[in-house]
Structure formats: structure tokens, C-alpha cells
Regions:
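Short gly/pro/ser/thr-enriched loop/turn and capping motifs at secondary-structure boundaries
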Residues: 13-18, 53-54, 77-81, 96, ...
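Short, small-residue-biased leader/transition segments that mark boundaries at the very start
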Residues: 1-6
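Phosphate/diphosphate-binding loops
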Residues: 28-81, 86
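Phosphate/pyrophosphate-binding active-site segments
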Residues: 71-185
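General beta-strand structural signal in soluble alpha/beta enzymes
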Residues: 7-10, 47-48, 88, 184-188
Length: 197
């Protein structure tokens, strides 16, 4: 009711459906464009049940507003005090219900306006771009162009899998073909981050 946008983390991915108009996706190092753009401008971040790990905060870099404050709703006293936030030791559902009612009673509205739709549109374009990534022997540059010996890694990948599918293109196919209630389970590595994005 107050147009507060919502971002999620890997552990809380299923708490708000990704199609909700105020859900801007995952935030942080493994997050997505939409959430990270808004995180840079947020003056209040409400963390619900989060540990505010380095992945979430991009080592505290992602929240760049000079007056950003944190309200941390958590059952863990240790995590509730992180980032010098205001600690609210409470059950997540009860606290959010009370907060929503208080905001509705006061008539307060978030100031994001059309900015949410704008970053979601940019995110959709970015998602389609990475879904369409095609490996090409001579000119392929990965999204994360690190220190690996690419030619050796690509050669080994092709030998083991007899494939040149990129991880993001496979995720695109899965996202477009699996039923809405399907669940993908991922382990460690780059896959959880790609799934969150």
C-alpha cells in the first residue's frame, strides 16, 4: 500500500513472487541490475531476517546514499545490530504486518514513483541479453572476464560436455519452459548468483 519496493536474497528467494510489481529482484554482489540500482539510492533499508553478508551488501559498497539508515528486523540479536542499524528483535511476519499497518495509517508513500518500473524494464532487457549469449570460438568474452586461461577452460568444457551452451542461456530456457511452480535447486559456485539475477 505504501509502494515500498522489495528485494530478495538467495535464502529468501521465495518470500515474494518475482512477478510482484514491487519486487526488484536480488540485491548485492550476486544480485541484479534493478535492485542494485535502487540500493545505491536507498535512504532506508529494511532488512528482514538477513545477516547482511558481504554478498548482500557487496562488502558494504552497494548502499551509497550518504544518509542511508538500516532497520534490521531479525530474531537474531547479533544480526539485528549489523550495519549500525536500528535493531528490531521480532518475528518477520508480525513486524512487517505492524509496519505495513503503521505506514497505511500515516498515509506515507515511498518516493520511488516510476523509477521502479524504469529499473525493472532495464533489468528485463539485461536478462534477455544474457539469455541470448552464444559462445563463439573466436570472439566470445564471458560476463566475468577474469584471470582464467579461457581457451583451456573452453576446450575442457567442450570435451567434457560436448556442448557450447552458456550457463545463462540454459537458465533462460529453463525459465521460459518450466511451469511457474517449479523449483530449481543449486549448489555453490556461479550458478546460485546467476539464478538470483
Amino acid at each position: 500500500s505504501s509502494d515500498v519496493c522489495s528485494s530478495d536474497l538467495q535464502a529468501g528467494k521465495g518470500t515474494v513472487v518475482s512477478s510482484h510489481p514491487l519486487n526488484v529482484g536480488g540485491v548485492g554482489e550476486t544480485g541484479c541490475l534493478a535492485a542494485n540500482l535502487l540500493a545505491k539510492e536507498a535512504d532506508l533499508v529494511i532488512g528482514v531476517g538477513t545477516r547482511f553478508s558481504d554478498f548482500t551488501t557487496a562488502s558494504k559498497w552497494i548502499f551509497q546514499h550518504p544518509e542511508v539508515r538500516f532497520l534490521n528486523i531479525n530474531v537474531s540479536n547479533f544480526d539485528a545490530w549489523k550495519l549500525d542499524g536500528i535493531a528490531m528483535l521480532a518475528d518477520a511476519r508480525e513486524a512487517m504486518t505492524a509496519l505495513d499497518a503503521a505506514l497505511a495509517d500515516s498515509g506515507w508513500q515511498a518516493g520511488w514513483g516510476a523509477q521502479i518500473e524504469s529499473v525493472q524494464s532495464r533489468q528485463l532487457k539485461e536478462t534477455q541479453r544474457v539469455y541470448q549469449a552464444v559462445w563463439q570460438e573466436k570472439s566470445f568474452v564471458p560476463e566475468i572476464d577474469d584471470h582464467l586461461d579461457r581457451e583451456s577452460v573452453y576446450r575442457e568444457f567442450r570435451q567434457i560436455t560436448d556442448s557450447t551452451l552458456t550457463q545463462s542461456s540454459v537458465l533462460g530456457v529453463l525459465n521460459e519452459t518450466l511451469p511457474a511452480e517449479a523449483v530449481i535447486v543449486a549448489a555453490a559456485g556461479s550458478l546460485p548468483g546467476d539464478l538470483q539475477r
